[in-house]
Amino acid sequence: MDARMEAKKPYLIICEGDSEFAYVQELNRFLNEKGLPIVFMARNAGGGGFKNLRQICRTLKTRKNGRTYIVADKDIYQRDDNGNGTAYGKEKDHMPPFLFQTWNFEDFLLMHFSLDVVSAWREEAARSGHLRNPLHGSAYLPIFQAFCVRNKDALKFMFPYEKGDMPFALTDSHVELLFANNAEDSFPHSEFATLIQKILQ
């Protein structure tokens, strides 16, 4: 990573919930320790529903300025739960860009580890049906937790994992693997990771 860059204004990241908020805080710690003059200001929206995120944007008086983004799980938009996908399609042009995690934060977490781990998770997701159609949290979270236990030597997570946790401290290796595992048409995929990589280049 190139630390020779000018100090920049903070990026405002509207996080759909506790997990994303915790991640951005950990990312800031990592960047600060690396001496990189990049800051992400996180705001916790308390839920990833489109109406909720739209209201947060209105409250914060956000605009499309190249420095404000919304980080959200894609699962409820893909399933169109409560019309979220439909509303997003109609109104997205009037809001800051959405950076989707495919499908959810837990998928995103595993992108920070080896290709062997990511490949094993893809196989698990294919068996459960999560690969093609995102499962609801009540269905995928036990699968994810069991996967983490089976792969604890490779993951070195804090156990037991609960939603809202940032279960490991970011390192150079984690960030490099996140970028390496973030192929455009693969699963998992993170548009937030794409933004981070672009900023750090």
Regions found by a protein language model. Name each.
Residues 49-53:
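Conserved helicase/translocase motor-coupling segment
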Residues 1-8, 21, 25-42, 54-69, ...:
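C-terminal accessory helical subdomains adjacent to catalytic cores in phosphodiester-
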Residues 12-16:
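Short hydrophobic beta-strand that contains or immediately precedes a catalytic carboxylate
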Residues 44-47:
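Conserved helicase motor
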